[in-house]
Each structure stands twice: as C-alpha cells, then as structure tokens.
Amino acid sequence: MHSPEARLAVARLAPSRIREVANVGMGREDVLAFWFGESDEVTPAPIRAAANEALAAGDTFYTQNLGLPALREAIARYQSNLHRAIAAESVVVTNSGMSALMIATQALVGPGDRVVVVTPVWPNLLEIPKILGASVESV
C-alpha cells in the first residue's frame, strides 16, 4: 500500500525548534523546562477535583464549537473588568494557543499572500502562514 504524501507546503515546514529543544532537555534535572509554556507545578487540587467531578458525572461529550457558553461568559466578564467591555459572543475558546493562532490566520491569510512577521517571535508562528500557502518575510 502506498503511503499518502503530505502537501508540498506541509512537507516544506521547518521542524519545531521548541520540540528540538525539549527533546534535548527532557529528563535532565539540570535544565529548567521552559519549552512548552507549562508550569512545573502540579495542577492545583481544585482544578483536578473539578475534572474528576466532570468525569464522574459523565460530562465527557463535545461542546459547542465556540466553547461552553458559561466559560465564554466568564472570560468576557473577566476581560471586561480587566480592560474594556467585551460580549461573550465575541469570545471563542480553543484547545490551545496554536489552534487559536491557526484559526485567526485562516480567517485572514490565503494562498499567495505575503505575511510580514516582526521577529523575534515564537518559531511555530512562522509556519502557520506557510501551511496556508502564503509566504513569510521576517523583519
């Protein structure tokens, strides 16, 4: 059976520099793990308890595409108190920063577009426009 090949735009993507660094540093006690932006602390007990309660209650199904309405409302309230008023309808919850960046870029960038990126920047960000068929110029 012939394996499918990735589109040329995907095959040309640079490997994740963050993953390269993580692979070298993982498991070493003399290295501080700053590569993925995750805490070195265990997830707080109230969050773990809420996750366990949701699992026990069978709350394990897909949610609305834009995120749970209660979560979107809470984020809107928080942002409104912190900065300026924002409606819950303007909030979209994603599963990661990369997903959010990909969705936002898909809304703005298409094949043949040229994206100018002010560097330094998170290395993975430079690859998103390339996936969409755009060229990237770093300045």
List the predicted regions and their residue ranges:
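N-terminal small-domain helix-loop-helix segment of the aminotransferase-like
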Residues: 11-96, 103
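PLP-dependent aminotransferase-like
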Residues: 106-139
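Short, hydrophobic alpha-helical packing/hinge segments within bilobed ligand-binding/sensory domains
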Residues: 100-101, 125
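Generic N-terminal amphipathic, Lys/Arg-enriched alpha-helix
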Residues: 1-10
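Short, local alpha-helical segments
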Residues: 4, 57, 138-139
